[in-house]
Structures are given as structure tokens and as C-alpha cells.
Amino acid sequence: MKKIFYILSAALFIGCCSAPVEQTAEIQVIGHRGGRYEVDENTLSAFVESYNNGVRAYETDLRLTADNELVITHDASLKRTFGVDVDTEKLTRAELAQYKSLKGNPVLFVDELAKFFSDKEILYVEWEMKSNNYTPKQLKLYCDKLYNTVMPLKPEGALYIFSSFDERAILTMLELHPDAECMYITAKPVCDEVLAKLAELDVRRVGCTIHATSRDAMKKAHEAGIIVNLWPGKCVEDFQLAYALGADIACSDVPVAVLNFAKENMKWIKTSKDLTLK
């Protein structure tokens, strides 16, 4: 299987680079939940460790606590990562602060992570809004608090993206903060249906599944000015496939392994990219 991906990458490189090798290909590698197969996902320890190992772009997830604080967690329950079956959205910040992950790390909150990033050489952070069960009133509070917490602390030159599977969250964020950069996430591959949804939302960033995404679909998306993030990225081979398909962003659970592999074996690739909309 690995040989297939080597061939894919080499073929794409040869086909695209009849000019000198200086025409480096670019793809932004981001650490999914900090790089969840390499670190204690979505804890401060995860981001510190991956940053110290060269990662400069991230995805993370957030939910609203019972006292309207923003907590960093993918699952509503802490059972999988902390070993306790409690609902983060039904507890206060003070109550959540009592828990330690299975690896001994405390619950992380958005203001703490934003502060950590504030003086770092961060290129890109995707703040994924977990909001499917929120009322319109909660959504407004959630989006406004998120924007006002992270944007004042954004490092100069960094790109902060507000993303969600919940299109209501995207529309609410844009209503409250028209300058916000938003991304729609879907479990579908890049396809006409997804491109139509982006047009409906008036958003030009999308996170799609790498499975069943084709080069033709990627070409069509890029012709429409869409920036594409392909996921999941469970291994180095998934990164190679994302690159071969022409992704702008590869969302990876093993970002350090990907960066090291690319440095040693895919020297024509720059693992960062200007992701501003043109």
C-alpha cells in the first residue's frame, strides 16, 4: 500500500513540475486535536508538545459549559479521554477543572489555549464549533464569546478559522462578526452537492472526507475559489493521498510524523501554505 502512495506522489510531482524544482508544492499540515494519535488530545500538554516538535497549525473543538464558559473537548462526555462519564455541557468550569485526563492532564478552556497561542509562531488554527444541540440564543452567546475570546489574542500573521458541521453556527458567526473566516465541514467528499451548499452559505472554505474525493472534484472546487481541507488523516499515507488529490490542507492525527516524513522523503513539498482567500 505504501508503494502505491509513493508512486502517486512521485507521478503527481513529475507531472506538475516540468519547470525547475524550485516550484515547490504547498500543503498546510494541521494537527487534529493537537495530533491526537501522538499526544493527549485537546489538552494544553498536547499543543505544547506538538508545537515543540514543529507543528504550527491546529484544529481543536469547543463546547459551552453550564455557566457559559468555552471548554476544549471533542466529545460532550469526558468518558473516552478522562475516564469519567460526565457531560461537559451540564457542568460549570469550576466543576470541570477538578478532572484529569487518563494521562493526567487537566481540562483545557478556550481562553487558556488562546493565551498559549498568543505569543507563538502560529500559522493557522481551526476552532471547530460543536453546537448541533444549541438553541439560537445559545448559539449567539457561543459564537460571540468564541470570537471575542480568541481574536484579540490571535498572533500577528496567523489565520483563525471558525468551522462547524452545524451550518447554523456558521451563519450565526457571520451575522455577528462579518469579518470572521468560516469553514463548513461535512462527512461527504468534495462533490457538486457540497459546492452548492458552500454557495448557499456564501463560504469558500470546506472540510471534506478524503474518501471518495477525486482529482476532478478538487479541480472543480479550486476553479470555484474554494480552499479544501481533507480529513481524516490517520497516518502518513493519508497525508500523501491528500497531497496527491491537491488538498490545500491535510488534517492529521500524526502531524509530527507527517512533517518528519515530508522533510526526509518529499523534499519538494512545503508543509505550510498561504490560505487567505483570493
Identify the meaning behind each predicted range.
Residues 16-278:
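Phosphate-group recognition and catalysis centered on beta-loop-alpha active-site segments
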